Amino acid sequence: MPLVGTKEMFKKAYEGGYAIGAFNVNNMEIIQGIVAAAKAEQSPLILQVSAGARKYANHIYLMKLVEAAIEDTGLPICLHLDHGEDFEICKACVDGGFTSVMIDGSKHPFEENIEMTRRVVEYAHERGVVVEAELGRLAGVEDAVKVNSKDATYTDPDQAVEFVERTGCDSLAIAIGTSHGAYKFKGKPELDFARLEKITNMLPGYPLVLHGASTVIPSFVEECNKYGGKLDGAQGVPEDMLLQAGKFGVCKINIDTDLRLAMTASIRKHLVENPGDFDPRQYLKPARQAIQDMVAHKMRDVLNSSNRL
């Protein structure tokens, strides 16, 4: 089975009132853990590659690992470019075999964002590739994406409609209060569900995307800190809020920080408890299992995407 796009995935998710997890990948163990969970849960799956992942591993290596996962499991997997910052990066990934790309022009003025997005949409659609765009800016840090809280802006519903109509993008990442990184809220977590509902009502049937949606699972934070880490104050998006978002037209929920925490917590624990171990397989194997268990939980209890294939 070849890589697949998201159009049919999102149609089913929207109609079924659930969301599909888009998990950021950086190496073999992360890919294996995520894919094993998707196979066990029979869940649709998006694997996505950020600027940091491309710099770290090279998207060609990651592409081959994803192709191996498809050959091994037979799962329908979408390979997505996360936060493509310009036309050339999106073009390279379209030409390289990605089935979905994101053009992130959210830091630019509205008209410039439209023009950037429209150009990518035209190129990608001619080659059968779907395009995600972004309107509104999330605070926080994720690889090359860094936005101060003072520069963050929520998505304007009226602009969202105009943006989709003028660009032809296939899905839209919106800002309703989530943020990148492990420190998403200083106080009580809040998402603007009234804004989300308004956007959904104004764009009926249209798939929306939430970035910065890791829960920053407390047990992983505690384990990291217990075994030498320093993640005081880390806080994410409560799982019940993410489950609710899937009922309001959010078809894709991005998860990265929770993967990092699952792997790091497991490795820290293993090396403290087994100080004589130096074979990477000894600590990467349980880390891979930790990722698999966490992703399976997300699919089953948060995204509601289990048994949707």
Predicted regions span which residues?
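Acidic-and-aromatic substrate-binding clefts and catalytic sites of carbohydrate-active enzymes
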Residues: 55
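C-terminal alpha-helical cap/extension of soluble enzyme domains
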Residues: 226, 237-309
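Alpha/beta enzyme core
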Residues: 4-12, 27-52, 60-76, 84-207, ...
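Short catalytic/ligand-gating loop segments at beta-alpha or beta-beta junctions
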Residues: 211-215
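Generic N-terminal amphipathic, Lys/Arg-enriched alpha-helix
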Residues: 4-21, 277-281
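Basic/polar N-terminal segments that are highly enriched at the extreme N-terminus
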Residues: 1-3, 309
